[in-house]
Protein backbone atom coordinates (compact mmCIF):
# COMPACT_ATOMS: atom_id res chain seq x y z
CA UNK A 1 0.00 0.00 0.00
CA UNK A 2 2.91 2.40 0.82
CA UNK A 3 4.52 1.92 -2.55
CA UNK A 4 1.26 2.62 -4.33
CA UNK A 5 0.92 5.91 -2.44
CA UNK A 6 4.42 7.04 -3.45
CA UNK A 7 3.72 6.19 -7.06
CA UNK A 8 0.51 8.16 -7.03
CA UNK A 9 2.36 11.19 -5.64
CA UNK A 10 4.94 11.02 -8.42
CA UNK A 11 2.33 10.73 -11.13
CA UNK A 12 0.29 13.61 -9.77
CA UNK A 13 2.37 16.78 -9.10
CA UNK A 14 -0.56 18.42 -7.37
CA UNK A 15 -0.34 15.82 -4.71
CA UNK A 16 3.10 17.30 -3.58
CA UNK A 17 3.93 21.09 -3.43
CA UNK A 18 7.66 20.37 -3.14
CA UNK A 19 7.74 18.51 -6.43
CA UNK A 20 5.80 21.30 -8.14
CA UNK A 21 8.31 23.95 -7.02
CA UNK A 22 11.20 21.80 -8.33
CA UNK A 23 9.58 21.47 -11.78
CA UNK A 24 9.01 25.24 -12.02
CA UNK A 25 12.68 25.95 -11.22
CA UNK A 26 13.86 23.56 -13.94
CA UNK A 27 11.62 25.24 -16.50
CA UNK A 28 12.95 28.67 -15.59
CA UNK A 29 16.55 27.41 -15.86
CA UNK A 30 15.92 25.88 -19.29
CA UNK A 31 14.20 29.06 -20.44
CA UNK A 32 17.21 31.11 -19.32
CA UNK A 33 19.60 28.83 -21.15
CA UNK A 34 17.42 29.07 -24.27
CA UNK A 35 17.51 32.86 -24.17
CA UNK A 36 21.26 32.80 -23.60
CA UNK A 37 21.80 30.51 -26.58
CA UNK A 38 19.54 32.70 -28.71
CA UNK A 39 21.59 35.75 -27.79
CA UNK A 40 24.83 33.86 -28.59
CA UNK A 41 23.39 32.76 -31.93
CA UNK A 42 22.36 36.32 -32.73
CA UNK A 43 25.83 37.57 -31.79
CA UNK A 44 27.42 34.85 -33.92
CA UNK A 45 25.25 35.88 -36.88
CA UNK A 46 26.36 39.47 -36.42
CA UNK A 47 30.00 38.34 -36.29
CA UNK A 48 29.52 36.26 -39.44
CA UNK A 49 28.07 39.23 -41.30
CA UNK A 50 30.97 41.37 -40.14
CA UNK A 51 33.52 38.79 -41.24
CA UNK A 52 31.84 38.49 -44.65
CA UNK A 53 31.87 42.26 -45.09
CA UNK A 54 35.51 42.39 -44.02
CA UNK A 55 36.36 39.60 -46.45
CA UNK A 56 34.70 41.50 -49.29
CA UNK A 57 36.63 44.64 -48.37
CA UNK A 58 39.91 42.72 -48.25
CA UNK A 59 39.20 41.13 -51.65
CA UNK A 60 38.54 44.56 -53.12
CA UNK A 61 41.78 45.86 -51.62
CA UNK A 62 43.66 42.83 -52.98
CA UNK A 63 42.27 43.42 -56.47
CA UNK A 64 43.18 47.09 -56.26
CA UNK A 65 46.69 46.17 -55.11
CA UNK A 66 47.09 43.63 -57.93
CA UNK A 67 45.88 46.17 -60.47
CA UNK A 68 48.32 48.70 -59.05
CA UNK A 69 51.20 46.21 -59.33
CA UNK A 70 50.22 45.45 -62.93
CA UNK A 71 50.01 49.15 -63.67
CA UNK A 72 53.46 49.72 -62.18
CA UNK A 73 54.96 46.80 -64.11
CA UNK A 74 53.23 47.71 -67.38
CA UNK A 75 54.96 51.06 -67.83
CA UNK A 76 58.43 51.09 -69.44
CA UNK A 77 60.85 49.95 -66.75
CA UNK A 78 64.54 50.66 -66.25
CA UNK A 79 66.96 47.72 -66.22
CA UNK A 80 69.29 47.67 -63.23
CA UNK A 81 71.56 45.36 -61.32
CA UNK A 82 70.88 44.29 -57.75
CA UNK A 83 73.85 44.86 -55.48
CA UNK A 84 72.94 44.44 -51.81
CA UNK A 85 69.96 43.78 -49.53
CA UNK A 86 69.70 46.34 -46.69
CA UNK A 87 66.55 44.95 -45.01
CA UNK A 88 63.38 43.16 -46.05
CA UNK A 89 61.90 46.24 -47.71
CA UNK A 90 64.95 48.12 -49.03
CA UNK A 91 68.05 47.42 -51.06
CA UNK A 92 70.84 48.94 -53.16
CA UNK A 93 70.74 48.67 -56.94
CA UNK A 94 72.95 49.96 -59.74
CA UNK A 95 71.42 51.50 -62.83
CA UNK A 96 72.75 51.42 -66.37
CA UNK A 97 73.79 55.07 -65.98
CA UNK A 98 76.47 54.02 -63.51
CA UNK A 99 74.73 55.39 -60.38
CA UNK A 100 73.73 53.39 -57.31
CA UNK A 101 70.35 53.89 -55.61
CA UNK A 102 68.83 53.01 -52.24
CA UNK A 103 65.35 51.82 -53.26
CA UNK A 104 62.24 50.16 -51.88
CA UNK A 105 61.45 46.58 -52.87
CA UNK A 106 57.95 45.56 -53.91
CA UNK A 107 56.38 43.32 -51.25
CA UNK A 108 55.32 40.71 -53.83
CA UNK A 109 58.90 39.97 -54.95
CA UNK A 110 60.49 36.71 -53.84
CA UNK A 111 63.46 37.77 -51.71
CA UNK A 112 65.34 34.55 -52.51
CA UNK A 113 65.73 35.71 -56.13
CA UNK A 114 67.48 38.91 -55.06
CA UNK A 115 71.10 37.86 -55.36
CA UNK A 116 74.09 40.09 -56.14
CA UNK A 117 74.44 40.84 -59.87
CA UNK A 118 70.85 39.78 -60.56
CA UNK A 119 69.11 41.75 -63.30
CA UNK A 120 66.11 43.68 -61.93
CA UNK A 121 63.46 46.06 -63.27
CA UNK A 122 63.14 49.50 -61.66
CA UNK A 123 60.24 51.94 -61.82
CA UNK A 124 61.14 54.78 -64.13
CA UNK A 125 60.09 57.54 -61.68
CA UNK A 126 60.66 56.21 -58.15
CA UNK A 127 63.37 53.62 -59.03
CA UNK A 128 61.50 51.14 -56.83
CA UNK A 129 62.42 47.52 -57.50
CA UNK A 130 59.30 46.01 -59.11
CA UNK A 131 60.49 42.80 -60.78
CA UNK A 132 63.37 40.32 -61.01
CA UNK A 133 64.40 39.38 -64.54
CA UNK A 134 65.56 35.92 -65.64
CA UNK A 135 69.35 35.50 -65.81
CA UNK A 136 69.38 35.57 -69.63
CA UNK A 137 66.98 38.50 -70.02
CA UNK A 138 69.69 41.18 -70.03
CA UNK A 139 72.41 39.23 -71.78
CA UNK A 140 73.37 38.91 -75.42
CA UNK A 141 75.21 35.67 -74.66
CA UNK A 142 73.43 32.51 -75.76
CA UNK A 143 74.16 28.88 -76.49
CA UNK A 144 74.32 27.54 -80.01
CA UNK A 145 71.41 25.16 -80.43
CA UNK A 146 71.80 21.91 -82.29
CA UNK A 147 70.29 23.45 -85.42
CA UNK A 148 72.51 26.53 -85.17
CA UNK A 149 75.77 24.63 -84.95
CA UNK A 150 77.90 25.02 -88.10
CA UNK A 151 77.97 22.15 -90.57
CA UNK A 152 81.76 22.28 -90.94
CA UNK A 153 83.57 18.99 -90.37
CA UNK A 154 87.25 18.22 -90.03
CA UNK A 155 87.22 16.84 -93.57
CA UNK A 156 86.20 20.27 -94.87
CA UNK A 157 89.49 21.72 -93.64
CA UNK A 158 92.36 20.93 -95.96
CA UNK A 159 95.63 20.20 -94.20
CA UNK A 160 96.15 21.43 -90.63
CA UNK A 161 96.62 17.82 -89.49
CA UNK A 162 98.81 18.77 -86.53
CA UNK A 163 96.45 21.55 -85.49
CA UNK A 164 93.45 19.20 -85.67
CA UNK A 165 95.19 16.64 -83.49
CA UNK A 166 96.28 19.19 -80.90
CA UNK A 167 92.87 20.82 -80.52
CA UNK A 168 91.13 17.45 -80.29
CA UNK A 169 93.55 16.39 -77.56
CA UNK A 170 93.09 19.65 -75.66
CA UNK A 171 89.33 20.17 -76.04
CA UNK A 172 87.41 17.11 -77.23
CA UNK A 173 89.30 14.35 -75.42
CA UNK A 174 89.00 15.87 -71.89
CA UNK A 175 85.24 16.24 -72.38
CA UNK A 176 84.61 12.76 -73.77
CA UNK A 177 87.28 10.68 -71.96
CA UNK A 178 88.09 12.56 -68.78
CA UNK A 179 89.00 9.30 -67.02
CA UNK A 180 92.13 8.95 -69.18
CA UNK A 181 93.66 12.05 -67.62
CA UNK A 182 92.74 10.82 -64.14
CA UNK A 183 94.44 7.48 -64.76
CA UNK A 184 97.59 9.19 -65.99
CA UNK A 185 97.46 11.66 -63.10
CA UNK A 186 97.51 14.96 -65.00
CA UNK A 187 95.07 17.82 -65.40
CA UNK A 188 93.73 18.42 -68.91
CA UNK A 189 94.46 21.79 -70.53
CA UNK A 190 92.13 24.58 -69.44
CA UNK A 191 92.40 26.81 -72.49
CA UNK A 192 93.68 26.79 -76.06
CA UNK A 193 94.99 29.74 -78.08
CA UNK A 194 94.75 29.61 -81.88
CA UNK A 195 97.01 32.18 -83.51
CA UNK A 196 98.38 32.86 -86.95
CA UNK A 197 97.94 35.08 -90.03
CA UNK A 198 94.43 35.82 -91.31
CA UNK A 199 92.77 33.15 -93.40
CA UNK A 200 94.70 30.15 -92.08
CA UNK A 201 91.68 28.28 -90.66
CA UNK A 202 91.48 29.25 -86.98
CA UNK A 203 87.77 30.04 -86.89
CA UNK A 204 87.08 27.22 -89.34
CA UNK A 205 88.66 24.70 -86.97
CA UNK A 206 86.62 26.08 -84.06
CA UNK A 207 83.47 25.56 -86.16
CA UNK A 208 84.49 21.95 -86.73
CA UNK A 209 84.92 21.49 -82.97
CA UNK A 210 81.42 22.89 -82.40
CA UNK A 211 80.02 20.50 -85.00
CA UNK A 212 81.73 17.35 -83.75
CA UNK A 213 81.27 17.71 -80.00
CA UNK A 214 78.00 17.26 -78.13
CA UNK A 215 78.99 19.82 -75.50
CA UNK A 216 77.27 23.19 -75.28
CA UNK A 217 79.04 25.76 -77.45
CA UNK A 218 79.18 29.47 -76.67
CA UNK A 219 80.67 31.78 -79.31
CA UNK A 220 81.47 35.41 -78.60
CA UNK A 221 83.65 38.03 -80.25
CA UNK A 222 86.06 40.00 -78.10
CA UNK A 223 84.59 43.33 -79.15
CA UNK A 224 81.15 42.32 -77.77
CA UNK A 225 82.48 42.71 -74.23
CA UNK A 226 83.26 46.40 -74.77
CA UNK A 227 80.03 48.14 -73.77
CA UNK A 228 78.96 51.73 -73.33
CA UNK A 229 78.45 51.70 -69.56
CA UNK A 230 81.01 50.93 -66.89
CA UNK A 231 80.82 47.42 -65.47
CA UNK A 232 78.80 45.96 -68.34
CA UNK A 233 81.81 44.26 -69.94
CA UNK A 234 82.99 42.42 -66.80
CA UNK A 235 79.38 41.43 -66.09
CA UNK A 236 79.12 39.88 -69.57
CA UNK A 237 82.31 37.90 -68.92
CA UNK A 238 80.77 36.57 -65.70
CA UNK A 239 77.57 35.72 -67.58
CA UNK A 240 79.50 33.74 -70.19
CA UNK A 241 81.24 31.56 -67.63
CA UNK A 242 78.07 31.24 -65.51
CA UNK A 243 76.16 30.03 -68.57
CA UNK A 244 78.95 27.58 -69.37
CA UNK A 245 78.91 26.17 -65.82
CA UNK A 246 75.13 25.74 -65.87
CA UNK A 247 75.31 23.84 -69.19
CA UNK A 248 78.52 21.89 -68.61
CA UNK A 249 80.16 20.23 -70.43
CA UNK A 250 80.63 23.39 -72.46
CA UNK A 251 83.11 25.10 -74.79
CA UNK A 252 83.62 28.87 -74.85
CA UNK A 253 85.05 30.24 -78.10
CA UNK A 254 86.26 33.85 -77.97
CA UNK A 255 87.17 35.09 -81.44
CA UNK A 256 89.42 38.13 -81.97
CA UNK A 257 90.43 38.07 -78.32
CA UNK A 258 93.06 40.77 -78.92
CA UNK A 259 90.20 43.32 -78.75
CA UNK A 260 90.14 42.93 -74.94
CA UNK A 261 93.38 41.12 -74.07
CA UNK A 262 96.16 43.45 -75.19
CA UNK A 263 99.08 44.00 -72.84
CA UNK A 264 98.15 46.34 -69.98
CA UNK A 265 99.61 49.82 -69.77
CA UNK A 266 99.09 53.03 -67.82
CA UNK A 267 95.64 53.86 -69.18
CA UNK A 268 94.80 57.54 -69.48
CA UNK A 269 91.16 57.28 -70.55
CA UNK A 270 88.13 55.63 -69.03
CA UNK A 271 87.63 53.42 -72.08
CA UNK A 272 91.12 51.93 -71.77
CA UNK A 273 90.61 51.32 -68.06
CA UNK A 274 87.30 49.58 -68.76
CA UNK A 275 88.97 47.27 -71.31
CA UNK A 276 91.61 46.42 -68.72
CA UNK A 277 88.87 45.62 -66.20
CA UNK A 278 87.36 43.23 -68.74
CA UNK A 279 90.75 41.53 -69.13
CA UNK A 280 91.18 41.21 -65.36
CA UNK A 281 87.71 39.67 -65.04
CA UNK A 282 88.59 37.22 -67.82
CA UNK A 283 91.82 36.28 -66.07
CA UNK A 284 89.94 35.77 -62.81
CA UNK A 285 87.26 33.60 -64.40
CA UNK A 286 89.82 31.40 -66.15
CA UNK A 287 91.66 30.83 -62.89
CA UNK A 288 88.56 30.72 -60.75
CA UNK A 289 86.21 28.22 -62.35
CA UNK A 290 86.31 24.74 -60.89
CA UNK A 291 88.43 22.35 -62.91
CA UNK A 292 86.00 19.53 -62.14
CA UNK A 293 83.41 21.39 -64.21
CA UNK A 294 83.90 20.50 -67.86
CA UNK A 295 84.36 24.00 -69.29
CA UNK A 296 87.00 24.59 -71.97
CA UNK A 297 88.07 27.90 -73.47
CA UNK A 298 89.24 28.43 -77.06
CA UNK A 299 90.62 31.81 -78.10
CA UNK A 300 91.62 32.95 -81.58
CA UNK A 301 93.66 35.96 -82.66
CA UNK A 302 95.80 37.28 -85.49
CA UNK A 303 98.04 39.27 -83.13
CA UNK A 304 99.36 36.94 -80.47
CA UNK A 305 102.34 39.27 -79.94
CA UNK A 306 100.06 41.95 -78.46
CA UNK A 307 98.35 39.74 -75.86
CA UNK A 308 98.90 40.24 -72.15
CA UNK A 309 101.52 37.87 -70.67
CA UNK A 310 99.21 37.02 -67.76
CA UNK A 311 96.75 35.48 -70.22
CA UNK A 312 99.41 33.46 -72.02
CA UNK A 313 100.90 31.84 -68.96
CA UNK A 314 100.38 28.09 -68.35
CA UNK A 315 97.34 27.45 -66.22
CA UNK A 316 95.14 29.72 -68.30
CA UNK A 317 96.09 29.00 -71.91
CA UNK A 318 97.97 25.73 -71.57
CA UNK A 319 98.19 24.98 -75.27
CA UNK A 320 99.07 27.46 -78.00
CA UNK A 321 98.44 26.22 -81.54
CA UNK A 322 100.06 28.09 -84.41
CA UNK A 323 98.42 28.29 -87.83
CA UNK A 324 101.17 29.22 -90.32
CA UNK A 325 100.70 29.87 -94.01
CA UNK A 326 100.35 26.53 -95.81
CA UNK A 327 103.39 24.87 -97.32
CA UNK A 328 103.34 22.97 -100.59
CA UNK A 329 101.71 19.85 -99.15
CA UNK A 330 99.11 21.90 -97.26
CA UNK A 331 98.33 23.89 -100.42
CA UNK A 332 97.67 20.68 -102.30
CA UNK A 333 95.29 19.43 -99.61
CA UNK A 334 93.42 22.74 -99.49
CA UNK A 335 93.06 22.82 -103.28
CA UNK A 336 91.75 19.25 -103.22
CA UNK A 337 89.14 20.09 -100.58
CA UNK A 338 88.03 23.29 -102.31
CA UNK A 339 87.70 21.64 -105.74
CA UNK A 340 86.19 18.34 -104.57
CA UNK A 341 82.66 19.45 -105.57
CA UNK A 342 83.64 21.56 -108.58
CA UNK A 343 83.18 20.45 -112.19
CA UNK A 344 86.77 20.79 -113.44
CA UNK A 345 88.03 20.21 -116.93
CA UNK A 346 90.59 17.45 -117.43
CA UNK A 347 93.03 20.13 -118.56
CA UNK A 348 93.10 21.79 -115.14
CA UNK A 349 96.41 21.03 -113.41
CA UNK A 350 96.19 21.98 -109.74
CA UNK A 351 99.82 21.04 -109.22
CA UNK A 352 100.79 24.05 -111.32
CA UNK A 353 99.23 26.40 -108.77
CA UNK A 354 100.50 24.38 -105.81
CA UNK A 355 104.10 24.61 -106.99
CA UNK A 356 104.08 28.39 -107.38
CA UNK A 357 106.24 30.14 -104.77
CA UNK A 358 103.65 32.75 -103.75
CA UNK A 359 102.74 32.65 -100.07
CA UNK A 360 98.99 32.37 -99.95
CA UNK A 361 96.60 31.45 -97.17
CA UNK A 362 93.87 28.83 -97.20
CA UNK A 363 91.25 31.56 -97.49
CA UNK A 364 92.98 32.90 -100.61
CA UNK A 365 93.01 29.40 -102.12
CA UNK A 366 89.26 29.15 -101.50
CA UNK A 367 88.82 32.59 -103.08
CA UNK A 368 90.82 31.48 -106.15
CA UNK A 369 88.54 28.48 -106.65
CA UNK A 370 85.43 30.59 -106.15
CA UNK A 371 86.64 33.22 -108.60
CA UNK A 372 87.39 30.52 -111.18
CA UNK A 373 83.85 29.23 -110.83
CA UNK A 374 82.46 32.75 -111.21
CA UNK A 375 84.38 33.21 -114.47
CA UNK A 376 82.87 29.98 -115.81
CA UNK A 377 79.38 31.18 -114.84
CA UNK A 378 80.04 34.49 -116.59
CA UNK A 379 80.89 32.63 -119.80
CA UNK A 380 77.80 30.38 -119.49
CA UNK A 381 79.89 27.26 -119.11
CA UNK A 382 79.32 24.26 -116.87
CA UNK A 383 82.99 23.26 -116.85
CA UNK A 384 85.84 25.21 -115.28
CA UNK A 385 88.84 25.60 -117.59
CA UNK A 386 92.50 26.37 -116.75
CA UNK A 387 92.10 29.96 -117.94
CA UNK A 388 89.37 30.45 -115.33
CA UNK A 389 91.77 29.35 -112.61
CA UNK A 390 94.47 31.61 -114.02
CA UNK A 391 92.17 34.62 -113.89
CA UNK A 392 91.13 33.72 -110.36
CA UNK A 393 94.75 33.35 -109.32
CA UNK A 394 95.71 36.72 -110.75
CA UNK A 395 92.67 38.38 -109.16
CA UNK A 396 93.59 37.19 -105.67
CA UNK A 397 97.37 36.81 -105.71
CA UNK A 398 98.94 38.74 -108.59
CA UNK A 399 97.57 42.12 -107.58
CA UNK A 400 99.13 45.35 -108.84
CA UNK A 401 101.54 47.04 -106.47
CA UNK A 402 99.32 50.11 -106.31
CA UNK A 403 96.55 48.21 -104.54
CA UNK A 404 96.31 48.34 -100.74
CA UNK A 405 99.22 50.71 -100.29
CA UNK A 406 98.59 50.87 -96.53
CA UNK A 407 99.65 47.22 -96.15
CA UNK A 408 103.20 48.05 -97.13
UniProtKB/Swiss-Prot annotation:
Keywords (A to Z) from UniProt: Acetylation, ATP-binding, Coiled coil, Cytoplasm, Nucleotide-binding, Nucleus, Phosphoprotein, Proteasome
Q: Which domain of life does the UniProt lineage start with?
A: Eukaryota
Q: What is the effect of changing residue 158 to E?
A: Impairs the light-specific hypocotyl elongation response elicited by a glutamate receptor agonist, BMAA
Detail which positions bind ATP.
Answer: 196-203
Q: Which residues carry this modification: Phosphoserine?
A: 16
GO MF annotation list: ATP binding; ATP hydrolysis activity
Q: Which pairs are disulfide-linked?
A: none
Q: Which residues carry this modification: N-acetylalanine?
A: 2
What PROSITE patterns does the database record attribute to this sequence? AAA
InterPro entries cross-referenced by the UniProt entry:
26S_Proteasome_ATPase (IPR050221), AAA+_ATPase (IPR003593), AAA_lid_3 (IPR041569), ATPase_AAA_core (IPR003959), ATPase_AAA_CS (IPR003960), NA-bd_OB-fold (IPR012340), P-loop_NTPase (IPR027417), Prot_ATP_ID_OB_2nd (IPR032501)
Subcellular localization, per the record?
Answer: Cytoplasm; Nucleus
Q: In which tissues is it expressed?
A: Expressed in dark-grown etiolated seedlings, roots, leaves, stems and flowers.
One GO location term (cellular component): cytoplasm
Q: Where this protein primarily resides, as one coarse class?
A: cytoplasm
Q: Which residues form a coiled coil?
A: 28-75
Q: Which family does it belong to?
A: Belongs to the AAA ATPase family.
Subunit arrangement? Component of the 19S regulatory particle (RP/PA700) base subcomplex of the 26S proteasome. The 26S proteasome is composed of a core protease (CP), known as the 20S proteasome, capped at one or both ends by the 19S regulatory particle (RP/PA700). The RP/PA700 complex is composed of at least 17 different subunits in two subcomplexes, the base and the lid, which form the portions proximal and distal to the 20S proteolytic core, respectively.
- Known function: The 26S proteasome is involved in the ATP-dependent degradation of ubiquitinated proteins. The regulatory (or ATPase) complex confers ATP dependency and substrate specificity to the 26S complex.
Q: What is the name of the protein in this document?
A: 26S proteasome regulatory subunit 6B homolog
Amino acid sequence: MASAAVASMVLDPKASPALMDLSTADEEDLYGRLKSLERQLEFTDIQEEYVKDEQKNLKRELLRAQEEVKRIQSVPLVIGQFMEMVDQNNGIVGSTTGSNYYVRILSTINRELLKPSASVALHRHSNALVDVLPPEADSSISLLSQSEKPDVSYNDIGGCDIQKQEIREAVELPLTHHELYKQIGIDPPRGVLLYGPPGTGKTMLAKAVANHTTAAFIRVVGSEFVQKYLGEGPRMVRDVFRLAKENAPAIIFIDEVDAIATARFDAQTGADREVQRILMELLNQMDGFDQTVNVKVIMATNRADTLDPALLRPGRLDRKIEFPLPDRRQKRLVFQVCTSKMNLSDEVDLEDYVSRPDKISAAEIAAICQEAGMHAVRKNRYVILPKDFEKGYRANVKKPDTDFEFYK
